[in-house]
C-alpha cells in the first residue's frame, strides 16, 4: 500500500512538472499571461521611433522562443527566464 501511494505521488509530481509553462508580462497592459508552449523567455523591449523625443520609447513585453537581436533603435532589451521577470 505504501509503495502504491509513493508511486502515485511520484507520477503526480512528474506530470505536473511536464505541464509547466512560463508566465510573462504582456504589453500594452503589463498583465501576466501564460506563454505559448515553446516560448519560455520573457522579454521587454524599449525602442525609439521618430516620436521618441515627444512621447518616449515604445515599450513591448511578451514571450519568445529566442531573445530578439538588439537593434540600433532600441533603448533597451531585456530577456529573462523566470515568471513575470520582464517588468
Curated annotation (Swiss-Prot):
Expressed by the venom gland. InterPro entries: Snake_3FTx (IPR003571), Snake_toxin-like_sf (IPR045860), Snake_toxin_con_site (IPR018354), Toxin_cobra-type (IPR054131). One of its GO terms (molecular function) is toxin activity. It comes from the Eukaryota. Keywords: Acetylcholine receptor inhibiting toxin, Disulfide bond, Ion channel impairing toxin, Neurotoxin, Postsynaptic neurotoxin, Secreted, Signal, Toxin. It is found in: Secreted. SUPFAM superfamilies: Snake toxin-like. The keyword Kinase does not apply. The keyword Flavoprotein does not apply. Its main location: secreted. Pfam families: Toxin_cobra-type. GO terms for cellular component: extracellular region. Gene3D superfamilies: CD59. Belongs to the three-finger toxin family. Long-chain subfamily. Kappa-neurotoxin sub-subfamily. Postsynaptic neurotoxin that binds and inhibits neuronal nicotinic acetylcholine receptors (nAChR) with high affinity (IC(50)<100 nM). Is a selective, and slowly reversible antagonist of alpha-3/CHRNA3-containing and some alpha-4/CHRNA4-containing AChRs. Homo- and heterodimer; non-covalently linked. This is Kappa 1a-bungarotoxin. It comes from Bungarus candidus.
Amino acid at each position: 500500500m505504501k509503495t502504491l501511494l509513493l508511486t502515485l505521488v511520484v507520477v503526480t509530481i512528474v506530470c505536473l512538472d511536464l505541464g509547466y509553462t512560463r508566465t510573462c508580462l504582456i504589453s500594452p497592459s503589463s498583465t501576466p499571461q501564460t506563454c505559448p508552449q515553446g516560448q519560455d523567455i520573457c522579454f521587454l523591449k524599449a525602442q525609439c521611433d521618430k516620436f521618441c523625443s515627444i512621447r518616449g520609447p515604445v515599450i513591448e513585453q511578451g514571450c519568445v522562443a529566442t531573445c530578439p537581436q538588439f537593434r540600433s533603435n532600441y533603448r533597451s532589451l531585456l530577456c529573462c527566464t523566470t515568471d513575470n521577470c520582464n517588468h
